[in-house]
């Protein structure tokens, strides 16, 4: 597989800004569904790695939740732009591990970027409300706040767009994320993380 940006093909998990293996050293084979050829191996993560990812994401949440809606919007827009810039490579990775024709894979990459663009705009529209109170002289004020760490489990058949659809929504409102991609298609998820790690402040808030 020839990529313009070889740094997008990762064979380790992404936790707290670092590429790490499993504590046990165990790995899972990833196969090309067309040829059954082994593409590579990724860490077989256990409870300990999962707990570390969630704990680190919760630590990052304390800072991320304080960012303004505008700041989050700008970062998400840049993330979407970077995915579009790397669309050809991301499509190649998807095709070799998932089996979609290259044109269809690229279509999914662009669809995934459109989800990020959508939520980048929605980040600025998380409004509260004022509700009439049944008691005289009083009003009910509603505010919306980020809830914490969001776990995103994503399928093999849309290995890119379901990540961006879930994570962009969570990040837009100030939550941090931990992603569990399908074991058949981990490289698309890791490539999305690699894009954010290389160019954005997302390494502290997005884990795979």
Pin down the residues of each PLM region.
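Rossmann-like NAD(P) dinucleotide-binding subdomain of oxidoreductase/dehydrogenase enzymes
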Residues: 128-200
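Conserved protein kinase catalytic core
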Residues: 22, 38, 161, 186, ...
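Terminal low-complexity tails and localization/encapsulation signals of metabolic enzymes
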Residues: 1-41, 74, 78, 128-153
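Hydrophobic packing residues within well-ordered alpha-helices of enzyme cores
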Residues: 116, 189-192, 208
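Single conserved hydrophobic/aromatic residue that forms the stacking wall/gate
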Residues: 199-208
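Active-site phosphate/pyrophosphate- and oxyanion-stabilizing loops and adjacent acidic/basic residues
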Residues: 17, 92, 194
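Signature tryptophan residues that serve as conserved aromatic anchors
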Residues: 19, 61-64, 156
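Glycine-rich loop-to-alpha-helix module at the N-terminal edge of alpha/beta enzyme cores
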Residues: 37-126, 137
